[in-house]
């Protein structure tokens, strides 16, 4: 039933209630039938479930498969399970890191679950009683006054200047006047226009009234939003999609290489026996170990965690680890207006009148908002609070004014006459101040205050006032007028009709919820980074458009549409107009989700920011949802991927930069690790084809997990490139091998493999003095040292994709430290007896050590030369 279309009496009858409320027996019966007035929360997964969820990552599944195969072969061959244990340790550490980071984010948010008032005042059997809000039932009559939180959806049945602030639900920052009158408008009436309804999540900021509860718990508007969140599927991030693609490629690559090696090995043996098959299979497994970058999953997780830490320092709290880099490829940011682009605080920005101080005095005294001079804070209805703050900025003291001119009578504001009047004692006389809508107040004025005195109002004065009013409303300001009247003594008749006539006009004050000062620069930075901001708000279209123009969001050719207009569009029409619409006003929650989904369907990576409950479904539907930590509701914070701890839209720009840096660094690490594994695969493949063993599986695990992981992690700390915020966002469909990364992995893998094979043969020659193809202890040790150190030196090449290493101005000290640590560990592994025995190494001479290091160092000049050729080729293509 649309209660707002029916009278108060009809609503009470439909709900089987009375103006005196329910009896206690009726309330108990309905509570037992309908349940408590609480929002259902989806059960949170246990730590165990979250741990196993980490194991569902495709890269982890590949590692687990490798561990299983390795375990079977080790058991069959009665060999050590060291490989299996090491791989499983990597998997466990990676999963623990993921769970820890997500848990840490949850603690950082520390969301409050109190979404409604703890207690509410209701009428039970005609008496006002206080009850826990969770025990409210349909039909209860609420007793409300300024400062109360609305504990359930309700239909107003009595109103005395009642106003409610509904920004969290509708997005509109200006409080809405509430009355008991039924609405008669045709067509759909949006939440923000239902002037006789109150909703859970809103609050009373002025006046008092009574309302009958129409819905509780999950049946409220907030409950519908919470329910919609549980129906919305989480989207995979671009990084998750790319890593899944990489896992599939690696899986097929491993299977293909193993099949080839197994087939060639059996054919070379010339006979098929259990021993031949087992030996060949073990070689194939060693290749699988070489091909799989065991440390990649852990490196990605740790690099993301580093990014999370960096973002938290910039006031951005990440709740979902893989969402860290998603902002780096965001193309659309759909942002709420109130509290996100604006300050969510009405502020006087313009005035018109002969005496600004007198105008501010009138506005401040004809208001119920209170200024605390000790804390310099103002409490009260937002519009009146803005007027009081304005008086303070002009050097006036509202508390001193009230002491000097105490209020002795008043005609409170009501929505019918759109005015409020107060009478004050002034040294034996009475002065009246009246404020209200200009179109209502101006006709009641027959004088105007000019140059310190009241003069008769003329048509020219009225025209000038009307022009000022048009100018302010044209800038989407909310305009109030003020007037005064003096008496020798307090009049006997203080009714509004008697007081509000023969007034002296003082002036106009225009106010608006102003933009955050830093947002203008933030939006400009977004545009330079190729990101398009879209405003989505529940506020009026004129106000939204004015703010959008001020911010540069609404330019020539851009459109602003209302939720009603959007609702009237079919999907085809909306798709055609989507690219031209920059502002959406008076929208409902389902409209926001539709907008986000339309951009996603068009192939754009979309972010959604917001603080109100009305933003939560669209935040959940977006590729990355951004909530506000201070003004944001708990529902919104709980579904967001990222929470801005300072509620600052400008923080998003820093998060975008960090996201891009993280992706660049992950790609550096992936390129480094895959190139390294490519060199290992090619080395073992070539050695197998030639009939000798160059490295054992345990050697490869050492390289993959110790030698390679430290530099890969250090690459994850690389600083952002200078052009990172001037290049367009990358495509969500862009392969991780794009921009020549795949080619680099192949040629650099071949390069390191050739150097490794060369080290083996040189080592064999230095040991035996002959060039032959056979197993060699010194050759294996030199090959291990060369491969390890070649990858260490090669990690420095990864700092720049195409630029020369020697053009980088800032050193990566983490990488220098990682290289030194890897060199030390590798050297210890060769020369410390128990380690050398464990890895079956032979200590090599100083000359052999120097030769191996020299071969490894060659990766630097070789890659620098190739980069030079690539840069020249790129310049030729650019000129063509």
Describe the residue ranges of each PLM region:
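A C-terminal functional module that forms or caps the active site or interfaces directly
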Residues: 798
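Membrane-interface starts of transmembrane alpha-helices
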Residues: 82, 775-782
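Conserved cytosolic headpiece of P-type ATPases
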Residues: 1-729, 734-737, 750, 765, ...
